């Protein structure tokens, strides 16, 4: 098994940190500190070395320390391709982030070729009651760990979708270019939808196989393209291309693309109660979310033979003793780098004795 883990992390002008240097190894790491000390900021900085906008989905200017024009995050990381230096640079008001691998610039969506991460934060606990966009992005992050090229597919699909919207909005009479764009969107949609469905198969199997103290969930996706695949559509790309062509006039008026894989919704049901997670109590929702994360982590290791970095922000808060102890025992058996935040060590003393403690 190949382990992904940080050897060191360096922050400059990052949120509340002027400068911070951490040395770590492939063990559990507990960040201890009062609320506001910067525990979640450290997890967020690590998450920037994975496709997307980090675990907070924050605006870039919000990441820079107040009154500073830039911030830098550097990491020496044991990656899928061996030991490597990664860095990300953010300049205030530039609305762009520069990511480097061994001092060579790479696209953000290329990070899934090098790293593998799973995270759980308190903000994610509202994912079942929020908009479909949040759930879809959550699912796609899971897919990245099984299909590293998925991040690039989603990024390119969104680029061509914005190009299509622009052409329609500006009434550019270039039917050939529009046809090419819609063809690319259709081809990428087919791959994106198939990746999602295959990942859901993996995840459902993992959930059903894993016996733990958390409720089991039934996972599905509500999307026209994905449903066509399930129904055995043989000419999927042609179907998508035709739908995009037929909705041009409608989309021109709407100012957006009304059909496609960007409209799909990730649905989660409480298996035993047979109700959608959004109708469960907040405690049940957190428990279901933890169950999904545990299943994802287990199956990523089983299928890819890669142990991801696991980022857990306040995971023990509001858990009963049985579930807390189960998690502690589960984490103790893992041979992977795990980052956990808490305000104190009460109730996790045994776990702390086997972890690297970092006090803020």
Swiss-Prot record:
One Gene Ontology cellular component? cytoplasm
- Which biological processes are named by the entry's GO terms? DNA replication; DNA synthesis involved in DNA repair; double-strand break repair; SOS response
Where in or outside the cell? Cytoplasm
Record keywords: ATP-binding, Cytoplasm, DNA damage, DNA repair, DNA replication, DNA-binding, Nucleotide-binding, SOS response
**Which GO molecular-function terms appear in the entry?**
ATP binding; single-stranded DNA binding
Looking up InterPro entries in the UniProt record yields: DNA-binding_RecF, DNA-binding_RecF_CS, P-loop_NTPase, RecF/RecN/SMC_N, RecF_2
| Positions that bind ATP | 33-40
Family annotation (SUPFAM superfamilies): P-loop containing nucleoside triphosphate hydrolases
The role this protein plays is: The RecF protein is involved in DNA metabolism; it is required for DNA replication and normal SOS inducibility. RecF binds preferentially to single-stranded, linear DNA. It also seems to bind ATP.
**Family to which this protein belongs:** Belongs to the RecF family.
Q: Which protein is depicted?
A: DNA replication and repair protein RecF
